[in-house]
Amino acid sequence: MKDFKVEYLQILDENGNCDDTLMPKLSNDEIKKIYEMLILVRVFDQKAFNMQRQGRLGTYIQFKGQEACQVGSAFALHDEDFIFPMYRNSGLLIARKHPIVQVLQYWGGDERGLKSPPNVNNFPIAIPVGTQTVHAAGAAMAAKLRGTKQVSVVYFGEGATSKGDFHEAMNFAGVFQAPAIFLCENNQFAISVPRKDQTRAETIAQKAIAYGFEGIQVDGMDVFAV
């Protein structure tokens, strides 16, 4: 059996130490904008959670602790790239120029709140676990056929890796070499199911190897690594 290794990337550790050799080339203004967005989505998340507890929102799924993963990836994309979010991606939408009032509109029960802003390819939030993965693979294939430079990024939790849609999408993207990025936000629990009961694989990232493309493990709380 061929040996394999899954790379782990961390640039900024939990103590604020930065590996300058890996640091992306960002201006001070760009770093400031990223930091401001991290604060904005954190404050939004807490406010929306409070509103839900007050009965002012019907449902709301928090993303506390996952801000860097969503903001960092959003800043790395172009507006014309596709994103396929899950229910825990309100911060991602805001970072992708989705008006806050519309995000609250959606969580208040009005699906029109998910209408993508002009010139930004934000697809609607997927509530069923893992269904957005096949949509993302399809969009990536469409971009390849059209010859554009767009990429398709789909967001999901580790629980989605136990779903059939996930495997179909990964296999399709691998076979046809579609420009898709499968971004798993592993928060260690799929609602109530712990990570250890989802898979026997040592990492989620290594699943990519079986489908013929690269997988990398990244510190999701390190915005620069993301």
What spans do the regions from the language model cover?
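Positively charged, low-complexity intrinsically disordered leader regions
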Residues: L26-D29, K33-I34
